[in-house]
Amino acid sequence: MRIGFLGPKASFTYAAATAAFPEDQHELIPFETITEVIRSYERDLVDFAIVPVENSIEGSVHQTIDYLFLQADNLHTQAEIILPIRQQLMATDNQKKIEKIFSHPQAIAQSLKYIQEHMPDVKLEPTDSTAYAAQFVAQHPNKPFAAIAPVASSIEYGLTIIAHDIQEIHENYTRFWVLGKTRPQLNLVADTQKITLALTLPDNLPGALYKALKVFADFGINLSKIESRPLKTFLGEYFFLVDAVYSGDYLYLLNALEKLGVTVKQLGRYKVYKM
């Protein structure tokens, strides 16, 4: 099968992709941005698309969430891969003084405390992925550049790690979603099963959010996450992203929500695999 992922090779998404779909059995195809990864599936260029959705330090990856809610149709999360994230600061061998650090905005934010303490004057430059940052630094060996990226990137692009595990906390994890129309057969042991719904509440009704969430409580369904995101229509209008740990039939849940006037978009029902 063809698997689209946020590249280039040796990115964290690449690690999640190879954990679920070993490279000796599947064709892994890198794309430069999250949007391009998802669109590659929509254009039938790949069989599954893998994108980051949430980090334990920095929260949701809004580019993923917003695209799936606002633009994607007939595309659902079919599996979730949870990957431990260790951020490394790397450069070419001949760099003695670093003036600019490149990385994905999430990686920069996860490592900001270290940077502020040890390199307060350095300039920070966002890139589309951590691996692309490492690749760019390797392509400019005579520039005073460094990248924040995984260990695999230092190996892939011939860089030297100058500071190890610079993320703010040790327990740093990222959730990756496997997007598609069918559930993949993965040679992994599932940790649990979840559903993700996007709820749009009826306008200007007092207690609308409370009533919607009460439906989950009434059916004994445990929520693991709730987050508001702007509808990008008018100021103050939101949809609510809800994750619930649940493995049973949930059609009755959808019916109960819709009776309250809640518009429900199903983003996925999937097994969770923790690496």
PLM regions: where:
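Domain-level signature for soluble enzymes in the chorismate/prephenate branch of the shikimate pathway
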Residues: 1-275
